[in-house]
Amino acid sequence: MNNLLLYCRPGFEKEAAAEITERASNMQCYGFARVKDDSGYVIFELYDEEQADLLARKLPFRELIFIRQMLVVTHELKDLDVADRISPIIEATSEYTICGDLRVETADTNEAKELSAFCRKFTVPLRQALRSKELLTKKETPHRPVFHAFFMANDHLLLGYSYSFNNSEFHMGIPRLRCPPDAPSRSSLKLEEAFYVFVPREEWDLRLTSGMKAVDLGACPGGWTHQLVRRGMMVTAVDNGTMAQSLMDTGQVKHLRDDGFVWRPSKKNIYWLVCDMVEKPARVVHMIADWFRENDCQEAMFNLKLPMKKRYAEAVHNIEVLRGLLKEVDNAFVIQAKQLYHDREEITVHVYNKYWVSKLEAKE
């Protein structure tokens, strides 16, 4: 079989399909996407079956915007005997290379939520069976492939694998985060997820550390500011609205009632710039580029709101515009973009300069 299975946000299947089709063709890998609206996944069928594994290894997952997880599908099992689902799975995957982790998953849809509890319960016996047949390591092994069982119904599933060096580390491609009780809004989770997805965990003490100065444009009521404050940063919140009093009481927040597109810092001591303003993407992109051009920040996280149509094309266009603007400043900028779980009709973009980050590392 050897197709690709791609998880995405329900309602964004066409964007995921357009993205994988374009990115695969850039690698001379051709096929077509099978799309079912609001399903939360896309199946990409390749004309050359061997190319599914090639894409899973070589197409950089971190560069994909609308795709939450990418794996090779080797088998589709239908009409399983619910009294014994494990035997057909073992038989189908008997020639798999030994895997280091197991993920029993389903789509991120309301309809599939009923399957989630089943998937959790089924994981334990399947894990035991795979280990007994030496298809899964005795302990979780990060450097081995990941075994995926993707249930579409309790008697229907896709079997496959992903590479741990080129996949999402999260179950279903979704970080499991809880909204802090003192957060002014659930948008706080959006920035927290962005940190998990874009900033390597081993660099948090370097790039997300106490004492850093940060700016939050369009801050009110303070969801994103809350994430910066809880990491010990000193934050300038720029917004004409009202900030949550709980944040002001920390003593770490200075609230300026001003236009986020106009205000600029008087000192060159800002490390993080974050922005979640509802505005046309083109305007946001040019503003972000201006901040880096003037050396007003060292690293940025911001959202780009998407139109109702041509969302993939719009996202790619704005990222390429930003890339061009930043190249005029320095060739060392890195741009990452993702539609996060906590994003809706938007994507989150992360920008940093490799040279500036290396200087932080040198100080350590």
UniProtKB/Swiss-Prot annotation:
EC number in record: 2.1.1.186
UniProtKB keywords: Cytoplasm, Methyltransferase, rRNA processing, S-adenosyl-L-methionine, Transferase
Gene3D superfamilies: 3.30.2300.20, 3.30.70.2810, Vaccinia Virus protein VP39
Highest taxon listed in the record's lineage: Bacteria
GO biological process, any: rRNA processing
GO molecular function annotations of the record: S-adenosylmethionine-dependent methyltransferase activity
Catalytic reaction(s) noted: cytidine(2498) in 23S rRNA + S-adenosyl-L-methionine = 2'-O-methylcytidine(2498) in 23S rRNA + S-adenosyl-L-homocysteine + H(+)
Binding-site list for S-adenosyl-L-methionine: S187, C220, P221, G222, G223, D239, D259, D276
Subcellular location per the Swiss-Prot or TrEMBL entry: Cytoplasm
A Gene Ontology cellular-component term: cytoplasm
NCBIfam families tied to this protein: PRK11760.1 (NF008734)
Family named by the database record: Belongs to the class I-like SAM-binding methyltransferase superfamily. RNA methyltransferase RlmE family. RlmM subfamily.
Function description: Catalyzes the 2'-O-methylation at nucleotide C2498 in 23S rRNA.
Name of the protein: Ribosomal RNA large subunit methyltransferase M
Gene symbol of the encoding locus: rlmM
